[in-house]
Amino acid sequence: MYSRCIALVFVGLLASSLAANCYGPAGKLAVAEFDAFPSPVAVGGTVYIRTNIQPTYDMGSATVQLSVYYSDNFDVTGLKPVVDIPGLQLCNLSTSITCPITAGTHILAWEYRVPDVLPGTYQVKYTILEDNPPDGNPYSCIQFSITVEGQKTNEFTSWYQATLLGTALFTQPDYKLRQIGEALQVGPSGPLNGSISPVPYNGSIKYLSGSGDLVPNAFYDTSNFVWGLSGTMVKQTIGALGQISHIYQGECYLGYINNINTSIAGNFYDYMTPLIDGTFTLNWTYTDSSTAEINGVAQFQPAATIPYGWGFPLLYGRLGEHQVVTSDVGFLMIKGNMPFCTSGVCAAPPAQGGSKHHGLSSQKLGLAIGLPIAGVFLIILIAAAIIYYRKRRESEKEDGVFAVSRKPEYGSALVVDGIIEETMGSKTMQAMLDMRDDDESEHDSDDGYGRSGQSGRSGRSRSRSRSRSVSRSRSGSRDARSESDPGESASRDSDSD
């Protein structure tokens, strides 16, 4: 007799641990509310499970299949396909699951298939028993319903996680799955059209674009999204907290891959978005292989640290009729905040954790705020400089002081009240020397010699007039200088007399 093993050896019975997919352009999913009751369990113990499939709508001749397609150290027996008899409202499946004999985190995924069912709503109940008698008292009952629209294959898959710490199961506070039946947000009608080019992961977020925004727990038909992958894959399984990847018999969860064949094109369709908000990265890592086996790795990385029981299945999709290959990464952004969880306790994201959960990082947000502010300060600085320069020019003009720019041979001069205070240039200097000669000759002459004195004053007056008219041409300056020569000659004649 195996030791007792609790029914919820699978602690991860949360909204993120349960997913369903109904095919069709407007597929819907409804999940009932239930509680999870973690409790200690012995390593190597056995749990007996009886699954009641009880449809609320006649399933007709549909075949119900229950299978485990991934078991991490779990010994699962008794899972066999069951044929539903038309009109029968109850189907029972009994099985036993033996817990791993080693401590650690272990994953068990099992799947129900109800192909080709008629439109309607179906209920599925998981009745988990603690001990061997199939009719023993149930420890927990988990139920959810599926709404099928159209003649499409209906599949839904549950993932369970058991973390064995020594001889006891990892325990955490009770969690209640949020009811998402009536509050289900369905994606836009019709398919999302677009193209995604896989790019190497560089830490950035790539939005899955199309007609309408993606919302949590919504169904999207992305059959027109082409990934354009090629080659073959190598089978590999990786399991870690917050990072789950697996491909088994052509099927993979967290990036669900099914019906893979030897085609070298890839269409990713029937996308089931995560049940919780946040930023999620779907990594596809493939290497070449010469074998005919279906191989590959699909890796899913949530944006936040998550405790046991969270994180899968957060992303549900299907890759049909194609073989996916290459080494690339796809990105999916769900608007909103993903709960930030540590030690099994979930709370709102920390204030500084926004960059992990949103498209804008803190660095980009700082630039988005800082650059406009810097631009405003720059504009104010330029305007102040212009105003200061204009006021200075006006003040200088009022004082009669302004700068004059001339040709190189005339240099530049500073004119104060029409009088040249400082000059540069050979020709301008020569003009200044000529004016100095005029002044000296005028002082040497006597008032009795009116001709020479008048000529000297006339020359000085013309020189001052020439100084005030700074824009006069060079030829005009030479003419003015030549006009003063008779006065100078007369002054010299007077001196000789």
UniProtKB/Swiss-Prot annotation:
Kindly list the residue ranges recorded as spanning the membrane.
367-387
Point to the regions of Acidic residues compositional bias.
436-447
Q: Which Gene3D superfamilies match?
A: 2.60.40.770
Q: What is this protein called?
A: Serine/arginine-rich protein PSR
Which species expresses this protein natively? Physarum polycephalum
The record ties this protein, via Pfam families, to: E1_DerP2_DerF2
Entry-listed glycosylation sites: 92, 193, 202, 261, 283
Q: Signal peptide: which range, if any?
A: 1-19
Where are the Cytoplasmic topological domains?
388-497
Q: List, alphabetically, the GO terms of the cellular component aspect.
A: membrane
